[in-house]
């Protein structure tokens, strides 16, 4: 992780150590993503964050979680990406007029200043939300809270993400239903999150996000 986040995580050092030891100590249960990817979202320097996409927890399918909310490794065939990401790409094409990305890896967004942060940083394979309440939410709340004063726009897909953004004090929130197949047709499709974020950034006289993925 980038050193700029150290002061944010310092108060949680003992809590993080306990969490990681608990995960490593339970030999009967695997967890996702790999340990070295748990804080991967924080490779983006704190002062380079332009906008945030708040996720729920990592993909629970082996080989999919890589420490960036909604992103999958570039080695995953585009036809095999998770349904939520497929729907994100459908809205991406509709909103921006871009072509279909060739992979589900969202590293290009990170390079442009998008913090892809799950509120829960680990999960048991095949068990969505299995690590809810273990303590990650308190840690990621601190990460997000450290960015509030910059008045950054936030993409919040689903009520849990929206409620978290509101509770933490974000004012520029682009909210819609979650892109999962269960809710995408209830208002995610047509919500234009990417262009709306750029409109907010431009109104703040900030550089817009280059959302284009290859």
Enumerate the predicted regions with their spans.
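A polyanion-binding, active-site-adjacent surface
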Residues: 2-156, 160-168, 172-175, 179-184, ...
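Rhodanese-like catalytic fold shared by cysteine-dependent sulfurtransferases
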Residues: 186-190
């Amino acid at each position: 992780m980038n050193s700029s986040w150290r002061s944010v995580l310092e108060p949680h050092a003992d809590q993080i150590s306990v969490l990681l030891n608990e995960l490593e100590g339970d030999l009967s249960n695997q967890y996702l993503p790999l340990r070295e990817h748990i804080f991967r979202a924080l490779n983006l320097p704190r002062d380079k964050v332009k906008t945030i996409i708040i996720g729920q927890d990592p993909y629970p399918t082996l080989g999919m979680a890589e420490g960036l909310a909604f992103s999958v490794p570039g080695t995953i065939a585009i036809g095999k990406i998770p349904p939520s990401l497929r729907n994100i790409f459908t809205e991406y094409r509709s909103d921006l007029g871009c072509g279909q990305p060739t992979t589900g890896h969202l590293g290009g967004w990170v390079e442009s200043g998008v913090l892809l942060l799950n509120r829960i940083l680990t999960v048991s394979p095949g068990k969505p939300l299995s690590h809810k309440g273990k303590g990650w939410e308190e840690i990621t709340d601190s990460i997000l809270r450290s960015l509030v004063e910059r008045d950054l726009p936030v993409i919040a897909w689903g009520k849990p993400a929206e409620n978290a953004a509101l509770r933490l004090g974000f004012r520029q929130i682009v909210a819609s239903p979650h892109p999962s197949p269960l809710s995408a047709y209830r208002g995610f499709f047509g919500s234009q999150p990417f262009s709306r974020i750029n409109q907010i950034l431009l109104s703040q006289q900030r550089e817009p996000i280059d959302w284009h993925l290859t």
